[in-house]
Amino acid sequence: MKTGYLYLQTHPDHPGMVRFLTRDTLPDTDPASDSHEPAVRYVARFSDIEAAQMHVQNSLHHQLIDIDTHMYRASLPEAMAVVESDDLKHERVWLDPALGEQELGLMEQSIRTRRNRSRNLDRLWQGVGLLFAALLVLRMLGLF
């Protein structure tokens, strides 16, 4: 396992798209002097950065634009929610202070939606497992 930072980057020339990038060290979060430069908008630290990349890919695989540049078609609040709602242990290190209340509200709403969906899916699979365990016990007892 390799510790690292997962960060989200946006670019004014690519609205509605986000890049998920990784580094071993904390990325530079100073705002770009040129408004046409990419900007870091969110940083999280993971104890297993490769697993974090895999989880992002699994969550947003339908929105992947370019695997080489790690570019996805997603809003910034949705992209941040993908990271925040993941069950992997992580720590939010930095959040762009220029984010508005509306974007933060959308992120929180998306986090709740993703966590509820994951919880419901877990319950479904636990129910399926219990059903098959019960059928196995009935089969062993010769009742089924």
What are these regions (language model features)?
Residues M1-M17, R23-F144:
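Non-catalytic accessory segments flanking enzymatic or RNA/DNA-binding domains
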